[in-house]
Amino acid sequence: MDVIATTTTIVSDLDSRQPEIEAPIRIQPAKPISFSNGKRCHHHHLASEAVAVATYKECLKNHAAGIGGHALDGCGEFMPSPSFNSNDPASLTCAACGCHRNFHRREEDPSSLSAIVPAIEFRPHNRHQLPPPPPPHLAGIRSPDDDDSASPPPISSSYMLLALSGGRGGANTAVPMSRKRFRTKFSQYQKEKMFEFSERVGWRMPKADDVVVKEFCREIGVDKSVFKVWMHNNKISGRSGARRANGGVVVGGVGDSRQSVVPTNGSFSST
């Protein structure tokens, strides 16, 4: 009898504890954890519970859109209807104009916007990012390694443009100097010899006696191309001077009966 009574007592105790075991257990959600550079950091949402406050101003619904026009009803501010319910979108109508709240211009409250902005903490996730700036009271203190590790300040774009424009201008000024034509200077002896030879050949370069011309240029020390240019530049002045000296007759010209002959042996004679 004692055994049966004890068993009955144990069963009754289990029946009384059964509701406690079947009670649902609430599991608290874990807070988000982020790892930054090997350190565990908890996100602190400072003002996450703040709700943005917005007001709805004038109605912008175009009542003449069907006919291609533009007409407003003149409602200046959204007025909630008596059956307003934030959970029922159909009840969000204006009591003044009867339009839905979405047709009214939404205007955020600046004070509420500043309240819901969370504070941002500088937490570099790798070692390649720059460290945060020092506090204001430590800004003037510098370590001995700052001079070695500090990089030079960046060059502004205005200085770069000035440098490029200056370099471009220098290149432009140097180009005319490189293209300047070289002017050959002749001695008085060379001028007299070239003038005398040009008078004999009629101020024209003889193509048949090219050997004689080359020999003459070698004797006076002047290149053939240079002598040809000199003859071309002084042709007019040389012929006019010879015409004045001969009384209007040009040696080797059309009005002269004498013709200068340049033989192949280098001697000159007139016939």
Curated annotation (Swiss-Prot):
<feature type="modified residue" description="Phosphoserine">
    <location>
        <position position="16"/>
    </location>
</feature>
<dbReference type="InterPro" id="IPR006455">
    <property type="entry name" value="Homeodomain_ZF_HD"/>
</dbReference>
<dbReference type="GO" id="GO:0019760">
    <property type="term" value="P:glucosinolate metabolic process"/>
</dbReference>
<keyword id="KW-0238">DNA-binding</keyword>
<dbReference type="GO" id="GO:0042803">
    <property type="term" value="F:protein homodimerization activity"/>
</dbReference>
<dbReference type="GO" id="GO:0000976">
    <property type="term" value="F:transcription cis-regulatory region binding"/>
</dbReference>
<keyword id="KW-0539">Nucleus</keyword>
<dbReference type="InterPro" id="IPR006456">
    <property type="entry name" value="ZF_HD_homeobox_Cys/His_dimer"/>
</dbReference>
<keyword id="KW-0371">Homeobox</keyword>
<dbReference type="GO" id="GO:0005634">
    <property type="term" value="C:nucleus"/>
</dbReference>
<keyword id="KW-0597">Phosphoprotein</keyword>
<keyword id="KW-0862">Zinc</keyword>
<keyword id="KW-0479">Metal-binding</keyword>
<feature type="zinc finger region" description="ZF-HD dimerization-type; degenerate">
    <location>
        <begin position="56"/>
        <end position="107"/>
    </location>
</feature>
<dbReference type="InterPro" id="IPR009057">
    <property type="entry name" value="Homeodomain-like_sf"/>
</dbReference>
<feature type="site" description="Required for DNA-binding">
    <location>
        <position position="231"/>
    </location>
</feature>
<dbReference type="GO" id="GO:0003677">
    <property type="term" value="F:DNA binding"/>
</dbReference>
<feature type="region of interest" description="Disordered">
    <location>
        <begin position="125"/>
        <end position="154"/>
    </location>
</feature>
<comment type="function">
    <text>Putative transcription factor.</text>
</comment>
<feature type="DNA-binding region" description="Homeobox">
    <location>
        <begin position="179"/>
        <end position="242"/>
    </location>
</feature>
<dbReference type="Pfam" id="PF04770">
    <property type="entry name" value="ZF-HD_dimer"/>
</dbReference>
<keyword id="KW-0805">Transcription regulation</keyword>
<keyword id="KW-0804">Transcription</keyword>
<keyword id="KW-0863">Zinc-finger</keyword>
<comment type="subunit">
    <text>Homo- and heterodimer with other ZFHD proteins. Interacts with MIF1, MIF2 and MIF3; these interactions prevent nuclear localization and DNA-binding to inhibit transcription regulation activity. Binds to ZHD1, ZHD2, ZHD4, ZHD10 and ZHD11. Interacts with HIPP30.</text>
</comment>
<dbReference type="GO" id="GO:0008270">
    <property type="term" value="F:zinc ion binding"/>
</dbReference>
<protein>
    <recommendedName>
        <fullName>Zinc-finger homeodomain protein 8</fullName>
    </recommendedName>
</protein>
